[in-house]
Amino acid sequence: DIQLTYHRRHTTTTKVGNLEIGSEHPVRVQTMANTSTNDIDGSVAQANRCFAAGAELLRYTTQGMREVESLAQIRKAVQEFSSSGVTPLVADVHFQSDVADAAAKVVEKVRINPGNYIDPARKFKQIDYTDEEYQAELERLRQRFVLLLHICKEHKTALRIGVNHGSLSDRIMSRYGDTPEGMVESCMEFLRVAVAEDFKDIVLSIKASNTRVMVTTVRLLVWQMQEEKS
């Protein structure tokens, strides 16, 4: 028999509604809707099909406040369909931190992208920061992210920190380059704030189209988390 040396890393348990995620639980099945979030009837019908087929979480693109309002209606209808009550919805938010705040009051989980949560849309510009200026940017990040964490605590909403290789901020790119180290630091900036605020209902993801880059980055992230005991 082939003996595999890989094993699941021990983690805390993240609660997404009534669903538990972590090393002590099965790997969960999540999918993403391809309907317009504002097509409420179509989105509800697709959600019901997804959950009936075995999906455990369903993610919706959430571009603005109109989509947040639509998500609230979708969630209400989906919960009425569910016999178990375990049908968590996820809002996928980019560029607008206030939309993430609003979505956290409506659904069970919110995904944010560190590359555009508070930093402006990427312009592929090299920006030279002094150490003091860089720390000031990190403090600005902390102050804004803490507001979202407090909302999530109040509403028992989970968070996903979802880093994309293709959307690292100009700030990260200027200091770390287009590297696994930059992706890891983009994630860790937010995770450090969550740890300091004792917020544990959190999921991490790092994606790259190049699988070697992605595997290297995930391993580096695990090493960095172990170093910082986070």
Report each predicted region and the residues it spans.
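Active-site mouth loops of central-metabolism enzymes
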Residues: H7, V16, S23-G42, T61, ...
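Alpha-helix-loop-beta-strand connector modules within alpha/beta enzyme cores
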Residues: M65-A91, E139-K156, E185, E189, ...
